[in-house]
From Swiss-Prot:
Keyword tags: Amino-acid biosynthesis, Cytoplasm, Diaminopimelate biosynthesis, Lyase, Lysine biosynthesis, Schiff base
Membrane keyword on record: no
Protein name: 4-hydroxy-tetrahydrodipicolinate synthase
Domain of life: Bacteria
Site residues (Part of a proton relay during catalysis), renumbered to this chain: 44, 114
Length: 300
């Protein structure tokens, strides 16, 4: 996986709640021009749980088409880490095959949610999906949403026994897990899935981030990651601290509710629309977001 900084893309909707494909393409191009290495369509932040199978595939397709047709400032191509997660192994497998077929660079697969599989079930789930494709696979551990964690021994076993399982997105909130994973397998790539811990994870064995805040501030997230990769601890910490208030504001309600409203307030999307059961943020949250965006000089 030849990338380090990436954003977990929002999925913009029109007023009728259909996917706004033109806005989606524009958001991806902004990521490209502001220095991100990769984009991550249809993950948690992309509201994948309320997209149809057809919409899910179309979002991956748009991301790949846009990245292939738009050069980065360094004349390279931004990578696509396609979200293929589902609580049904068969559906994830179908999405994984589709993503590979149309040119995804790698796939991100969240643990099955709601059904709460055992560790053996998680192992078989990921093994089955990974063996159906040849491109790299990134595990995604976010127990606060899935109800079950990929325990460290299970993650290590998957890395050791399934050749194309190369990385894990860590959104468990546990630095102990990160240090343990890195201690036992230095080549197992760890990506931060917690914006508030980006700096800490990068300096505890992490090699990159998948950021929600990056939707709004891709340039600063990219700069922080690049500083960390060069072991410029203080410079990376300064950027992390600079982003602290924004990280806090963007998670005051369930993600992606605040980030979509923030993107709207910043003039980056026309409609801050959500599909039920997600709803618009409270008036208090909107005021907080406005104040925070003013603090960062995003809005006047």
């Amino acid at each position: 996986m030849q990338f380090h900084s990436s954003s977990a893309l929002i999925t913009p909707f029109k007023k009728d709640l259909s996917v706004d494909e033109a806005a989606y393409e524009t958001l991806i191009k902004r990521q490209i021009f502001q220095g991100m290495d990769a984009c991550v369509p249809v993950g948690t932040t992309g509201e994948s749980a309320t997209l149809t199978h057809k919409e899910h595939m179309r979002c991956i397709e748009i991301a790949i088409e846009t990245c292939k047709s738009t050069k980065t400032p360094s004349n390279s191509r931004m990578k696509v880490l396609a979200g293929v997660g589902s609580n049904a192994t068969s559906e994830s497998l179908s999405l994984a095959k589709f993503a590979q077929k149309i040119g995804a660079d790698a796939i991100l697969c969240v643990s099955p949610y709601y059904n709460r599989p055992t560790q053996q079930g998680l192992f078989e789930h990921y093994k089955t999906i990974a063996q159906s494709v040849e491109i790299p696979v990134m595990l995604y551990d976010v127990p606060s949403r899935t109800g079950v964690s990929i325990e460290v021994p299970t993650a290590l076993k998957l890395f050791r026994e399934v050749p194309n399982i190369k990385a894990i997105k860590e959104a468990s909130g546990s630095l102990k897990r990160v240090t343990e994973l890195h201690y036992y397998e230095k080549d197992f790539k760890i990506f931060s899935g917690e914006d508030s811990l980006n700096h800490s994870i990068m300096f505890s064995g992490g090699c990159g981030v998948i950021s929600v805040t990056g939707n709004l501030m891709p340039n600063l997230i990219s700069q922080m990651v690049n500083c960390a990769l060069k072991f410029e601890y203080q410079q990376a910490l300064e950027i992390q601290n600079k982003l602290f208030d924004l990280h806090q504001a963007l998670f005051v309600e369930t993600n992606p509710i605040p980030i979509k409203m923030a993107m709207h307030l910043a003039g980056l999307i026309e409609n801050p629309s959500y599909r039920l059961p997600l709803v618009a943020p409270s008036k208090e949250t909107i005021k907080l977001l406005e104040k925070t965006l003013q603090q960062y000089e995003v809005i006047a």
